[in-house]
């Protein structure tokens, strides 16, 4: 977006994100309490924080990020959100993780505090867990939600 955006209230983002806790994992879904994957979680939070999704997400395979070098998630987030340096990201920020060095960022989470984050994880569903050094060093991009 070309115009400056006002930021959504981080406390509101966190409250909305926590409402998704316990949602089962379901590939490509985005329905609180029913099922979601990590991208579906971010999409659902977007709808509650900002409003309707600005564009449809095409179907994707589980291994979509295993080949290629395009940072598809970062490009999409950059078009609608406010990018910040990962080290400066605080509670309520959407973060993108590289699951392997030099791989594209393909996992999404929401920072809950400086020491925890929320994400949808296969077999576990939506959980909140500590932002351990292992998770922290995987953060490749961070974005803030705009205000509705």
Cite the ranges covered by each PLM segment.
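Non-catalytic ligand/cofactor/substrate-binding and regulatory segments of enzyme domains
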Residues: 1-23, 130-148
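Short secondary-structure junctions
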Residues: 25, 79-85, 138-141
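Short glycine- and Lys/Arg-enriched binding-loop motifs that mark or flank ligand-binding interfaces
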Residues: 18, 25, 31, 36, ...
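A broad structural signal for alpha-helix termini and local helix breaks/kinks
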Residues: 21, 49-50
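...with weaker cross-activation on analogous glycine-rich loops/strands in unrelated enzymes
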Residues: 2-14, 55-125, 148
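Amphipathic alpha-helical interface surfaces
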Residues: 37-38, 42, 69, 73, ...
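Active-site nucleophilic cysteine motif
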Residues: 30-49
């Amino acid at each position: 977006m070309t115009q400056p955006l006002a930021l959504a209230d981080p406390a509101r983002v966190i409250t909305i994100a926590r409402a998704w806790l316990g949602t089962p994992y379901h590939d490509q879904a985005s329905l609180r309490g029913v099922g979601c994957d990590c991208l579906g979680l971010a999409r659902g939070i977007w709808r509650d924080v900002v409003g309707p999704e600005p564009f449809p997400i095409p179907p994707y395979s589980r291994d979509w990020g295993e080949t290629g070098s395009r940072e598809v998630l970062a490009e999409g987030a950059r078009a609608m959100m406010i990018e910040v340096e990962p080290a400066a990201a605080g509670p309520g920020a959407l973060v993108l993780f590289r699951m392997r060095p030099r791989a594209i960022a393909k996992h999404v989470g929401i920072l809950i505090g400086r020491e925890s984050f929320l994400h949808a994880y296969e077999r576990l569903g939506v959980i909140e867990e500590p932002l351990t050094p292992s998770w922290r060093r995987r953060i490749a991009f961070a974005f803030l939600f705009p205000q509705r």
